[in-house]
Design a protein with these regions (language model features):
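Internal alpha-helical scaffold of NAD(P)-dependent oxidoreductase catalytic cores
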Residues: 142-172
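NAD(P)+-binding Rossmann beta1-loop-alpha1 motif at the extreme N-terminus of oxidoreductases
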Residues: 1-49
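Short, charged/polar "capping" segments at the starts of alpha-helices
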Residues: 34-39, 108-111, 167
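Rossmann-like NAD(P)-binding element
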Residues: 51-101
Length: 172
């Protein structure tokens, strides 16, 4: 699977490392290049806790077009107050239909994301889902390191179109 992780904070680093460790091709995007400068040069996230080791990430970028070049799934790991801006940015730059999961979306985040996305892009419809919370209890300890204290046994997830839920869960 080709996954794009949006956001290089606590949960973004954890998710990128976990997906890569699982054999997926991972692109990690962050709006600020300075936040990812060290990872950009090494392509490694250092993990401790539930996931341990130095985990290689295929692509690290602050170029949204590169990040959205051909993902099978887009995982947004930023705070909810950035979702509207990201929906617009993704809508203006993505060139395929895929699954976008807000981690977390919580309170109608997927609905706001959908409405914003659709204002800017109707050519590439997206399946948009949100989780109740992030699956990791984690802390970014340095620019390129994350401590994953725990991974939750389950997290609620739903697409705006609930008929898609089984497919999304199977995919994840």
């Amino acid at each position: 699977m080709k996954a794009t992780v949006i956001g290089a904070g606590n949960s973004g680093l954890a998710m990128a490392a976990h997906l890569s460790r699982g054999g997926n091709s991972v692109t990690l995007w962050n709006r600020s290049g300075s936040t990812i400068s060290r990872i950009s040069s090494t392509h490694v996230i250092h993990c401790e806790g539930e996931i341990q080791g130095d985990i290689r990430i295929d692509t690290i970028t602050d170029d949204i077009r590169l990040a959205l070049k051909d993902p099978d799934i887009v995982l947004v790991t930023t705070p909810a107050n950035s979702h509207r801006e990201l929906a617009e940015l993704i809508a203006k730059n993505i060139r395929k239909s895929t699954v976008i999961v807000l981690n977390p979306g919580r309170t109608l985040g997927a609905l706001e994301f959908r409405r914003t996305y659709d204002r800017y892009n109707t050519e590439y419809p997206q399946t948009i889902a949100e989780t109740q919370t992030i699956i990791y209890t984690c802390r970014k300890t340095t620019e390129d390191s994350v401590h994953i204290m725990a991974m939750k046994d389950s997290v609620l997830i739903s697409a705006l179109d609930a008929r898609m839920n089984k497919d999304i869960i199977r995919y994840l």
